[in-house]
Regions:
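Acidic/aromatic-lined carbohydrate-recognition and catalytic surfaces
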Residues: 2-200
Length: 200
């Protein structure tokens, strides 16, 4: 069954850049790569995701749960910066990042805010507000998450850290590709604001 709304077209005349041809690419799911800044880690019960509170994994070597989308290991952009020399020695020429924009999941394919890097991957400079109580899945009470992911200082500091990462990667001869998921978003997205994080 053919349906035009599902037909994706290639960009006419697009040519693969020479630097990408034959390049050694290394894909990074940031949360599971390396924790370089523990101050930005998602906290247990910081908010609810898919009907339950999220959790911080304390033991980096603990295997993910079958439904591990609420588990956070704490990997971040500082962790990638800390490993650039290692990646260069591996022969990596391009880092391909899974989505890194503000999002409630560890995989970040359900974007909350396309304008900013998630402060849980970047920098949290303003950090206050209450966590959810056990069993409370109402994100209107998730004040810590709201501050962490909507405070402009946190968002701008996170974007700045990403720029720093790109500059340092380039200094190591590594190019950066990010996965931008623009054909769908999640219920936390500021346009829908189902969780009331953007309501004044």
């Amino acid at each position: 069954h053919f349906s035009e709304e599902w037909e994706f077209e290639f960009t006419p005349g697009f040519k693969t850049p020479d630097w990408a041809k034959g390049a050694v690419m290394y894909q990074i799911m940031v949360d599971r790569f390396n924790n370089g800044d523990k101050s930005n880690d998602v906290m247990t019960n910081e908010y609810a995701y898919i009907g339950r509170g999220v959790s911080k994994v304390e033991n980096w070597m603990e295997p993910p749960a079958v439904d591990g989308t609420r588990q956070f290991y704490g990997g971040d952009l500082q962790g990638v910066i800390d490993k650039l020399e290692y990646l260069e020695k591996l022969g990596v020429e391009v880092i391909y990042f899974n989505p890194i924009f503000v999002s409630p999941s560890n995989h970040k394919y359900d974007t909350q805010d396309y304008d900013y890097i998630d402060p849980h991957f970047g920098k949290i400079v303003n950090d206050n507000g209450k966590l959810l109580k056990d069993g409370d899945n109402n994100n209107e009470h998730a004040q810590r998450y709201k501050v962490r992911t909507t405070d402009l200082a946190n968002l701008e500091a996170s974007n700045k850290l990403f720029v720093e990462l790109v500059e340092k990667a380039h200094a190591h001869g590594i190019k950066i590709i990010i996965d931008g998921v623009f054909n769908h978003c999640g219920s936390f997205n500021k346009w829908m604001d189902k969780e009331k994080f953007y309501t004044k």
